[in-house]
Design a protein with these regions (language model features):
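Feature 926 captures the class I aminoacyl-tRNA synthetase adenylation module centered on the KMSKS loop
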Residues: 1-21, 25-27, 33, 71-109, ...
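Cytochrome P450 heme-binding Cys-pocket and its upstream "meander" loop
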Residues: 32-41
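A short glycine/serine-rich beta->alpha loop
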Residues: 44-55
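Substrate-binding cleft of carbohydrate-active enzyme catalytic domains
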Residues: 66-67
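Structured mid-domain segments that build the active-site/substrate or prosthetic-cofactor binding neighborhood
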Residues: 119-122
């Protein structure tokens, strides 16, 4: 080929440069640096972060680093988010020929953008491979997005009933009850955590913090506060509940907006823009929430966390005893690092349906211990004393022996004038629970349920079951939340007598204005309540 300028013969230069050179030159080549745009380049260099898939480790990541180091003796980026490859459900590479490839547009149409985004945020660290399949996406959608939406829907339902307008009230923190202060403390703690995690590119950690908060907001705060929203009128306690939940929903939506942009925008538009036309146009134009440090109460959060552990253990003890939560129990004993105040014990009692919660320094009296020698360790140590050790262990006071073992780390026995010192690894320890009591423990917390049921407790259990069945029938019959009803019952003299004696209590629980015993009408259903057959009916007034 001839040169168009001079007419001479052109020759290919012998040097060859890798095509990745162009990608590595991107930071300065895009600005024609150093020939122009010097200030603009220096303002943008190095980049805060770059992101690409893991195969770019030897490609773009390397070429950027190599060229920048040669030219500027400096890395061209401060952070790198490496993305693992998306695989199928079995961990195989997606391929059209294998038939395991997922069309992203089909997935978006089926699950929605937010659900897919959330799956990638919370599933694993960004640099690990992701096994993408519908069940995993739907599980994340249910646990976080579904819970957040249901909490939002709960608020909207009752706010509409009460014509609640958040712009007409202020959140008076100093006069809030403990449960409200706890939620606001957790809210600001999680905003702080998410902000810190995102600033440090810890994506799954920030997503998990959001999910944990939404779960506690829904399954603890809202569940514990429902009756405050159901109250008649607009008393201050009800206003406090509305304002606390409103603040939490709006704030957590702003914190989650970068991850689930569409759902949070919907929540923001309905909760904020619908009542305040002067509010910022979109949640994505709002600042990230600012942490109110003065609202963070770590002691309160720790106390509530311990309370939740006690409740979980109490539920486990109920399951072990095979006693449903609607059946009241007389007493629960708790051993913990510190005794909790009346506010907390009242919550525990209500959650676990027990009449009394007692803190005890020791619950060993409800547990018995028996010991046998661990032959593989005791045999070589003490040989001919083994039979004597076995006999001594069978006769020992189990509680005292266990206390000695925990205190000193050893159980000391006198075997015919010979001292035998046994550590925990030398012993086979069996525990048995005292009849009528069930024990559960986790770390430093132990709970004991007294499972002995008096006739009064059994009667109350029947009433709670009846209330539950009527509430179920209200839903099945399609009644609205605030509909007044008429209750009917027949075909079980024992239960009818109980319903007669507890008529007002039952009616108030299910929004009933009347009760007729001996006949049925409306929506009718047969039930077996604690092995007692009965026919119940509900009709809208």
């Amino acid at each position: 080929l001839k040169c168009p300028e001079c007419g001479g013969i052109m020759h290919r230069v012998p040097e060859v440069i890798d095509c990745w050179f162009d990608s590595g030159a991107m930071p300065f080549a895009q600005h024609h640096y150093p020939f122009e745009n010097k200030e603009l380049f220096e303002k943008q260099f190095p980049a805060d972060f770059i992101s690409e898939a893991v195969d770019q480790t030897r490609g773009w990541f390397y070429s950027l680093l190599a060229e920048s180091t040669i030219l500027f003796n400096q890395a061209p980026y401060e952070n790198v988010i490496v993305l693992g490859h998306v695989q199928d459900e079995n961990g195989q590479k997606m391929s059209k020929s294998k038939g395991n490839a997922v069309d992203p547009f089909d997935a978006l149409e089926k699950y929605g953008a937010d659900a897919i985004r959330w799956y990638f945020y919370i599933n694993s660290a960004p640099w690990l491979p992701n096994r993408f399949h519908g069940k995993a996406v739907q599980e994340g959608q249910r646990k976080f997005m579904g819970t957040l939406w249901n909490t939002y829907a709960f608020f909207v339902l009752y706010a509409n009933i009460d014509n609640f307008d958040a712009t007409k009230y202020t959140l008076d923190y100093d006069n809030l009850p403990v449960m409200d202060k706890w939620l606001l403390s957790k809210l600001n703690s999680v905003v702080k955590t998410v902000d810190d995690c995102l600033a440090n590119y810890k994506i799954p950690e920030s997503a998990r913090a959001l999910q944990e908060f939404v779960d506690e907001m829904s399954n603890w705060y809202v569940r514990r506060s429902r009756e405050r929203f159901w109250a008649k009128g607009m008393e201050q306690d009800k206003i406090n509940a509305y304002m606390t939940l409103y603040t939490a929903l709006v704030t957590i939506s702003k914190a989650a907006a970068p991850m689930i942009p569409f759902m949070t925008e919907e929540i923001y538009q309905n909760l904020v823009r619908s009542i305040d036309k002067e509010a910022i146009e979109s949640i994505h134009l709002c600042d990230f929430p600012e942490v109110k440090e003065e609202w963070i109460d770590k002691e309160l959060e720790d106390d509530m966390e311990e309370l939740l552990k006690i409740v979980v253990l109490g539920r486990a003890a109920r399951n072990t005893a095979n006693i449903k939560n609607r059946q009241p129990i007389g007493t629960m004993y708790v051993k913990a690092d510190k005794e909790m105040g009346e506010f907390y014990t009242d919550i525990i009692a209500d959650e676990l349906n027990v009449k009394e919660v007692k803190f005890a320094s020791d619950v060993e009296s409800f547990i018995s211990y028996s010991f046998k020698p661990q032959l593989r360790t005791v045999g070589p140590k003490y040989g001919k004393l083994l039979n004597g050790i076995r006999k001594a262990l069978s006769e020992i006071n189990g509680t005292e022996a266990m206390n000695e073992l925990r205190t000193t780390g050893l159980l000391t026995l006198d075997i015919d004038g010979n001292k035998a010192e046994l550590s925990e690894e030398d012993l086979l320890i069996e525990t048995a629970q005292t009849e009528g009591y069930v024990t559960e423990a986790d770390g430093d917390i132990s709970v004991v349920l007294d499972t002995n049921l008096t006739p009064e407790l059994i009667e109350e259990g029947f009433i709670r079951e009846i209330v539950s069945k009527v509430q179920t029938m209200r839903k099945e019959a399609g009644f609205e939340v605030m509909d007044k009803i008429h209750i009917y019952a027949k075909d079980n003299d024992k239960l009818l007598e109980l319903m007669k004696n507890h008529k007002e209590e039952i009616m108030s629980e299910v929004l009933a204005e009347d009760m007729t015993l001996g006949t049925t009408d409306g929506y009718v259903k047969e039930w077996n309540i604690n092995k007692e057959p009965v026919v119940l009916g509900v009709a809208k007034m």
